[in-house]
Amino acid sequence: MIEPRTLKGFRDLLPAQALAREKILDIARRIYRSYGFAPIDTPALEYLEILTGKGSAETDKQLYSFTDHGDRRVGMRFDLTVPFARFAAQHIATLGTPFKRYHMATVWRGENTQRGRYREFMQCDFDTIGTTSPVADLETVLVVHDLLVAIGIKRFTIRVNDRRILGGVLRSAGLAERSTDVLRSLDKLGKQSLDAVVDEMAGHGVPADVARRLVAMAALAGPPAEVLAAVEPLVGDDAVGREGIAAVRTLLDGVAQAGVAEGRVVVDPSIARGLDYYTGIVLESFLDELPTLGSICSGGRYDDLAGLYTKQRLPGVGASLGIDRLLAGLEELGRLATAETPAEVFLVHFDAAHLGDYLRIAAALRADGMTVEFFPEARRLGQQLKLAAKKGFRVALVIGTDVFARGTAQLKNLATEATTTIAWEGDLAALVDAVHSHLEAIRSDH
């Protein structure tokens, strides 16, 4: 007999987890659409050269790649941004610019597993391609803000930076040739100790005193205006770096004008993003109560990525919700719904002789927009109610043989165990209205 098991970093989702994920996906879809983003899809498998064109040595090591039956080198997508750049280059003549898309799909990375990090996970991306307008950068931050609010997260922080600022600091320090390695090292702040990051930079040829200054800069915190003022001297006269500072100031002004609460969006000079394709604004979002969980929604501007696949310039900006990490965080905080069913009403199967009546009642409740599960067997009442409570139904509707004769029904609130008698006297519409009203009252209490 084969032992049922899953690979390390891969997992099954039980109903409660899958339902919680679907709920967040529905919210993300609604928020993305409210800003005009349209859905697309791309293959899970791409030519390997598509995926490795603008990654990094670290990303390449994490790729699941192989030679297929046609002797082609192929790989599983490690994110949704690179396939989108290929997609845009291939279809831009049809799409037009600027083009706004969202994409929710599974990706694969052969990385070390840890809390909230898996080798197979889902990303929920949205991107705008074909414009360098700072409005697109601003909108990206606003979508992230609105999404986290809609999910019901009350305490979160969006941390922003600009890769041009970091580049300017490095050029002013004479480290332009080592910028890629230094940025990757800075991206590990918060995941590794300050000394470990300094040592790693030293391994890339950065003098220890310069490495400490860079780490000190990355650790700056406080009001955005003060952080930018402290970074400005480090950028010096570097024109591109000053463009980055101006871009962050413009972004913060827009965030304030859009009505985002003060303190929700802060400047964090350590935010670099590990992927090499980012060129401008970058952002990461954190649960304030679980800062060590890592970013739950990240992204930024990538103006050159599509240039790997087309001569047409297609600058882009976007972000991705890491739904699996977010779910892990919500579960740790005890804020994840535990219901194992999408249905709210459990219709008890009390008497097989009334099967037709039960089916008509269930159909009428569903036609009214309610979600209903009818138990398939006429088991003992206590047994059915115990199962209904375990699975997380809101109410159980009990109509027995004698109850059919009297024209009444029992509606049991499975959370409080309170029971309400409904006098419907064979009027199906009256029964539906009564159940609907009770459900609305229960929902409003939650």
Regions found by a protein language model. Give the residues of each.
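Auxiliary tRNA-acceptor-end handling modules of aminoacyl-tRNA synthetases
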Residues: M1-A18
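Short, conserved phosphate-binding/catalytic loop or strand-edge motifs used
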Residues: Y118-C124, V160-G168
